Regions:
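Sec-dependent N-terminal signal peptides
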Residues: 7-13
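Short, compositionally biased low-complexity segments enriched in polar/charged residues
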Residues: 48-79, 92, 96
């Protein structure tokens, strides 16, 4: 009887120690890998990749705010199509990125409202998305397909 009780207690103790172990962090996929899947899976117009310098010019995003990024915009000037994937360096930077992308979205809506009403509608239905430290903006006619790919990686 004593051996059985000792065995049960030892087993419970082992489970307690095992559950206290450090949990493995999920592997962070490169945002360029996510962008490659988006571009290969979704029908997009001719897109131009953005550099870190372009991020500063287009969105006011400083290099120190992000640890990884992938971004592209429509190569022509009359059709609004943007996919921006950013990984913030910390929570404060993530909040700053959300604000900057929201400002960009508001500016795009104001710009398109009088010139291209159909593009205005596309911009108005777009939103900035956050998944932990990953912040994204998707302005696209195929936004649902792109969001499904993002869900696969970040949900």
């Amino acid at each position: 009887m004593k051996k059985t009780i000792c065995f049960i207690l030892a087993t419970i103790l082992c489970f307690c120690f095992a559950s206290c172990g450090q949990k493995a962090e999920p592997a962070q996929v490169s945002l360029s890998t996510v962008m490659q899947e988006i571009r290969s899976s979704v029908s997009l117009p001719e897109m131009m990749d953005l550099t870190a310098e372009n991020l500063q010019d287009y969105f006011g995003i400083e290099a120190g705010e992000i640890t990884d990024f992938a971004a592209c915009i429509n190569a022509n000037g009359y059709q609004k199509e943007e996919i921006v994937l950013l990984r913030a360096s910390d929570a404060a930077s993530a909040e700053s990125l959300v604000q900057k992308l929201n400002l960009s979205l508001e500016n795009a809506a104001a710009e398109m409202q009088n010139y291209l009403p159909e593009q205005y509608a596309l911009v108005k239905q777009s939103a900035v998305r956050t998944d932990g430290l990953t912040v994204s903006l998707c302005i696209s006619e195929n936004a649902q397909q792109i969001e499904a790919i993002l869900d696969k990686y970040f949900k």
